[in-house]
Amino acid sequence: MNINMKTVVVALPGREYSGSFLKNWSQALIELTRKGYKVVMMNEYSSFVSFSRMKTLGLDVRRGATQVPFNGELDYDVWLTIDSDIFFLPEQLIELIEDTEKYPVVSGLYRMQDLQHYAAVKEWDLEYFKEHGTFEFMKVNELDTSEKYMKVAYNGLGFFACRKGVIENLKYPYFSYPLVEIEAEDGKLLRDMCSEDVAFCKNLKDAGYNVTVNTNLRVGHEKTLVI
């Protein structure tokens, strides 16, 4: 496909953006337009994060359980979502878009607030969960960057893209998932809820799609620092 004919839906869930984000988005929009991309921006907000993400796909609960993104009325090639606290460059955004040529689902990496981990889980290690009460996030100092594209079980949706046809194959509402139940060694039943991004990644896997991260595509993650 000629990239100069691609229509990219850029989802910006949220209602407050930093000056850095606005600068980065403005520069990216100029560069995307210059390169011939058609950009459709979807800015939506809800206090319930799952609804924010659903709204950026043009979803409406009144259309029922069999609905598809944008009611099937928007001809697009890539749906790409950027969280309001992500710091990115135009070339990173373009690389993420172009990666969808090779991978139906692809994401960049960004650090969590502890600075020691990425918002990514390589695999759902149940034994680790039983011991720690959480799954094991990828460590920054252990990332193998010689493997540019890596399959993961989960990556946060802060800088994330899907080729058209992927989400259409999921079951609405996409961002919810059944409770996860795990039996501990002492027989106790552990019950865990999925966040909306974990739910989305699990739904992708259930539909036969791998989540791939570009390990060279590391973006910033703005957080408040109290001094």
PLM segments and residue spans:
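Conserved catalytic core of nucleotide-sugar-dependent glycosyltransferases
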Residues: L89-I182
